[in-house]
Amino acid sequence: MNKLSLFVYLFFFLSFLFLFLYLLQPFFNPIVWAIVFGIVLYPLYGFIKRKLKSENLAAFLVIFIVLVAIVIPFTIFAVITAQQIIVFSIKVVNFVQTHSVNDLINSLKEIPFLKEKRESLEPLLNYLQSEEFRRALINALNSILTFVGDRLRSYVYTAGTSLFHVFVFLLTLFFILRDGEKVLKEIINSIPMKREDLEEILKTIYRTVLAVIYGTVGTAVAQSIMGFIGYSLAGVEFALIWALITFFAAFVPPFGAAFVWVPMDIYLFTTKGIKEGLILLFFGTFLISTMDNIVRPLVMKQGIKLPYVALFFSTIGGLIKFGFIGVFLGPIILSTMLASVKIYRRRVIHSGI
């Protein structure tokens, strides 16, 4: 093939590949989630397929398990959380309408911890009682409540789209389980790269997905459950919302769930009492944060080893650029890049190829 023919071929191939990916762009999230779940659930699919001797039936049963064990419970949890957010918002509005800023400042002055520091905090307390702060507070509360209301309305309006994305996710997962091995072989045979190098990259992606799933997500779920129990026993209102916040905070290094429970514990000690503060301190120190120090290393030690700073930026960058799915995409991109650098050093620098 001469250079002109090669150029024409590559031009048409890359052009239509770009158009195809552009068509898939609206379904990016459900497709990526389907790939992630396909990687994790493929051993289960293989086990069921060997028992039933049917690819279609095995894939359908895995989809049914995902629907019953993950999709439906998550939907119920989302509805309950939305209800608690609405109740919380109503309580905030009622509190603002029935209490003045001066009432709030006077109640703060009665907190034992602040009584001792009253003289040094007097300028701050005077500012908090000023008309300037009152206007700023009202504007901030209006902005927050408007944002919450807009988000809830958008979720209601896009319920149909969300259901369609769930359908796309389940449909894609079905075909990934049933035909994924065949498609993967075709991709491997079509990429002009040494087979062992390509397999190393694919194994890196596989190990990264499993490490993130079992390590990070598993730890976050365990921490949010322990957090919900601790918040409930300590008398924290809207414990389910705080447990949900704890779940997402668990993905943020370096402190994870401690970003939530430590400030909450300080609040309990200074406002509720020593008993409530000690309850959450026990749960936070010995149960919530211990999950991060024990569960995650045990699960991820057989997976990937990434530089901590690089992992921090890849996770945060993934969250910012791709949303929650970025928790997976960030480390995958990082680990694949490092694997590619390793291959480059082995093939090009050391071998001179």
From Swiss-Prot:
The keyword Phosphoprotein does not apply. Pfam families: AI-2E_transport. The keyword Isomerase does not apply. Its main location: membrane. One of its GO terms (cellular component) is plasma membrane. InterPro entries: AI-2E-like. It is a multi-pass membrane protein. It is found in: Cell membrane. The chain crosses the membrane at residues 4-24, 28-48, 60-80, 156-176, 209-229, 240-260, 268-288, 309-329. Keywords: Cell membrane, Membrane, Transmembrane, Transmembrane helix, Transport. PANTHER family: TRANSMEMBRANE PROTEIN (PTHR21716), TRANSMEMBRANE PROTEIN 245 (PTHR21716:SF4). Belongs to the autoinducer-2 exporter (AI-2E) (TC 2.A.86) family. This is Putative transport protein aq_740. It comes from Aquifex aeolicus (strain VF5).
